[in-house]
Structure formats: structure tokens, C-alpha cells
């Protein structure tokens, strides 16, 4: 005997489905934004916004210097404005890091020296007072661009914007930060022979390589950013591989080892 079961109509089936789906736990709603508008964020985080503006100016002047046909700022003027904006950025950042506290004692000086912001403040001032060296603009420009991208994603997230550019910026900064730090470290190292060559060509100051050596020593000893030490270690390993190669002439191999020993003997201890 076949049992006849009445099929539910469409209304009943949809209501049943809605009831079953309603009984399942729904995902929690996203948290409300911390700030209702960008202006509110700016009012609450004025220093961060000033730093962002200074970094944008650094990138702007760098583009005018590297791409002269933009024509908004003369190239020679743009070069020095790169380092002026960079010096302002790192001075403000250093002020934030030391929380506005200032003292003329050894403890404060030691605390100041280990700050990366102090290193790049010195870097910016040194090249602000020297003849133009195009490669010198690269580190501060890359740093400014990276921090500007990070700030843009932060302010858009915290003000409730859901633009598709936010995850792209976050992904870009996450994937490219290490590459950018490596480029910065290598450019800072390769500036040393370039500055020495400028002396022999009559375009550089005798004091510039010595001042720059102090900066590079500070970067090598940095605790927060080991990219300079890593770059030196990678270069040392590559040169040692070349020197140990059977195809490398003995005088060249000896010269490489002497250069490695000379540079290693002058490496400062890590702070």
C-alpha cells in the first residue's frame, strides 16, 4: 500500500527554509568605525596627519626631481626640498619617539642615538648641505612612500571606508616592505664609493664621506631594522663565494679577502 504524502506548497517551503536558516547562527556584524569622518580622525591624530603630509611632500618633490618634465618644481630646487621635507618628517617622528622629553645628559644622548629617526634626520641634514647626489634621494623617498601607503590604509579603515583599493594597498605594503628595505640598505652601502669618487672628481666635500660613515655605522648597529646588517652579510657571502671560486685569479681573491677584513674590522657593535 502506497502512502500518499501531501507536498508543501511554495509558501510553506520558503517559510520553512527561512526558519531553518534563521535558526542558524549568523556571522557577527563588522565593528563600527572608530571615527565617523576623516576630519574627526585628523582632529584626533594631528601629528600622524602632519607626518603623512610631510611624507607626501617628500614623494612629490622626489618625482619632480627624478622626472623633470613634470615641471611643477625645478629639479635643482626639488632635490633640496626632498631632504627638507624628509628632515622635517624625521624630526617630528623623533619628537614623538622621545615623547618631547629633552635633557643634556649621557643617558638621553644614548637614547637619541639608537633611534632610527635620528639616523635619518642626520642623513637628511647631511645631504641637504651637500652637492646633489641622485642616489641619496632613494632611501628617504622609499620610506616616505611606504609609510604614506600604510597611513592611507589605516585612515580609510578607521573611518569606515570600504574602497577596493584598501586591501590592494595592504597587500602591496605587506609583500614589498622587505624588498624595499633591501633596496634602501643596498643604496645606502653603494653610496660610500660614490661619495669617495665625488671627492676625486672635485664635486664632493672631504667631510661628507666621514659624516656618512657615522650614519652608516648607526644603521649597521640599529636594533629595530637589521636590513643594513643583512645586506652587508649577503654581500660578504657573495664576495667570499667569488674569492673561493677556482676561476678567480689569486691576486683578486687576496684583494677581496683584504677588503672584507678591512670593512669587518670597522663594523660597530649592535646597539
From Swiss-Prot:
Location in the cell: Membrane
Region entry Disordered, spans: 1-32
Main localization, broad class: membrane
Membrane-spanning ranges: 56-76, 125-145, 180-200
InterPro entries xref list: PER33/POM33_regulator, TMEM33/Pom33
Gene Ontology CC, one term: endoplasmic reticulum
A GO biological-process term: membrane organization
Superkingdom, natural source: Eukaryota
Keyword tags: Membrane, Transmembrane, Transmembrane helix
Membrane topology of this protein: Multi-pass membrane protein
Disulfide bonds: none
Keyword Membrane among UniProt keywords: yes
Compositional bias (Low complexity): 13-25
Family in the record: Belongs to the PER33/POM33 family.
PANTHER family listed in its UniProt record: TRANSMEMBRANE PROTEIN 33
Name this protein carries in UniProt: Transmembrane protein 33 homolog
Protein's gene: npp-25
